């Protein structure tokens, strides 16, 4: 069985035991999160009741891969290079 959940305006299709990276959550490592489920999906793509919630545990807080922002104005000797690493939270789905 799978569940469709929303975390920080992003939707994820998860099943029990999945590990995924989501935008930074205000929870300590080892805390359990209760996430409202939008829909429960059976193996035959049948939508079940959406009254359940999903339990997840926070594994760690990490940074995502670096994204380079490069600006340049030709013939003006102007170059600007910045990097950004988004903070993410690694979670594991315990139960649906």
Swiss-Prot record:
GO biological process assignments: translation
One Pfam short name: Ribosomal_L21p
Organism: Chlorobium chlorochromatii (strain CaD3)
Function summary: This protein binds to 23S rRNA in the presence of protein L20.
Keyword Protein biosynthesis: no
GO MF terms, alphabetically ordered: rRNA binding; structural constituent of ribosome
Protein name per Swiss-Prot or TrEMBL: Large ribosomal subunit protein bL21
SUPFAM superfamilies: L21p-like
Family: Belongs to the bacterial ribosomal protein bL21 family.
Keywords assigned by UniProt, alphabetized: Ribonucleoprotein, Ribosomal protein, RNA-binding, rRNA-binding
């Amino acid at each position: 069985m799978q569940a469709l959940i929303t975390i920080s305006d992003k939707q994820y299709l998860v099943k029990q035991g999945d590990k995924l990276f989501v935008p930074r959550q205000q929870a300590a490592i080892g805390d359990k999160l209760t996430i409202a489920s939008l829909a429960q999906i059976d193996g035959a793509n049948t939508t079940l009741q959406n009254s359940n919630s999903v339990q997840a545990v926070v594994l760690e807080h990490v940074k995502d891969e670096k994204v380079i922002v490069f600006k340049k104005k030709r013939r003006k000797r102007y170059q600007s290079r910045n990097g950004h690493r988004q903070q993410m939270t690694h979670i594991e789905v315990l139960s649906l």
